[in-house]
Amino acid sequence: MKDVNILVEALPYIKKFHEKKILIKYGGHAMIDEDAMSSTVRDTVLLKYVGMEPLIVHGGGPEISRSMDKLGKEPKFIKGLRVTDEETMEIIEMVLVGKISTDIVSQISYHDGKGISLSGKDSRLIFAHKKPVSKVTSESGGEEEIDLGLVGEIDCINTDLLEMFLKNNYIPVISPVGIADDGSSLNLNADTAAGEIASSVDAEKLIILTDVPGVLRDPNDPDSLIQRIKIDEVPDLIEEGVISGGMIPKIETCVKAIEDGVKSCHIIDGRKKHSLLLEIFTKNGIGTMIYK
């Protein structure tokens, strides 16, 4: 009887999100657990079979750093952003496009779905420009220039390409690599790419799978989860330090996506099995929802 009740509870959400686009951002830190990854991919295929249109944008930071270590290349970061020279860019593409994306597509096929691996360079899916050199105040009080190298800022998304694959029942799996005007590759922030794609395709939801339960009022207390945040509450939560560190850019991505038309954004723990289904098909969901 319990299983029947679960199915009955899911029905309104299956109807509500039928033929709606769901953008799933799968973070690199959430991919470390292979069982959870397999579960997430299987659940994504299920979304497709019940009539939704899921798209995946994946990260891969930990895997990129491990590959760089193996190749004797020291990862460098400035304010949390990876400094990207030409050699680093080659490694990033090798890991994101050549390994992670194809692994996800293989998992989709294993679960009887149709996946397609896409880089932002394919048919200029993600057109971008190099992030300008910026000036910041140094520790000594003077100005210093920061050049992140081949790091990009997104200009536009080729939605026609994505719509073509969605109409043919594919699940697009997108690596956050952009293409510049001269054809060169640019390293993109995966959260930002996910937000831009979500708003460009008029996604109903943007779901960010990461390695924390959501936004916690006390980072040491998992029971302090904030379940719902309105976008106009975000500045105060940042000022109070409730939203801090790596959570800030994720929340900022969510705020921009909602301002650009996405109905709601969700930050959930991708390490938890079936977290995707729990978020979409249950009344209370899990994690933190950001909305207007």
UniProtKB/Swiss-Prot annotation:
Major localisation: cytoplasm
Protein name: Acetylglutamate kinase
GO function terms (MF aspect): acetylglutamate kinase activity; ATP binding
EC annotation from Swiss-Prot or TrEMBL: 2.7.2.8
Residues the entry annotates as binding substrate: 60-61, 82, 187
Listed SUPFAM superfamilies: Carbamate kinase-like (SSF53633)
Localization: Cytoplasm
HAMAP family noted in UniProt: ArgB
Keywords carried by this UniProt record: Amino-acid biosynthesis, Arginine biosynthesis, ATP-binding, Cytoplasm, Kinase, Nucleotide-binding, Transferase
Species of provenance: Methanobrevibacter smithii (strain ATCC 35061 / DSM 861 / OCM 144 / PS)
InterPro entries: AceGlu_kinase-like_sf (IPR036393), AcgluKinase_fam (IPR004662), ArgB (IPR037528), Asp/Glu/Uridylate_kinase (IPR001048), NAGK-C (IPR041727)
Gene Ontology cellular component annotations, sorted alphabetically: cytoplasm
Highest taxon, organism lineage: Archaea
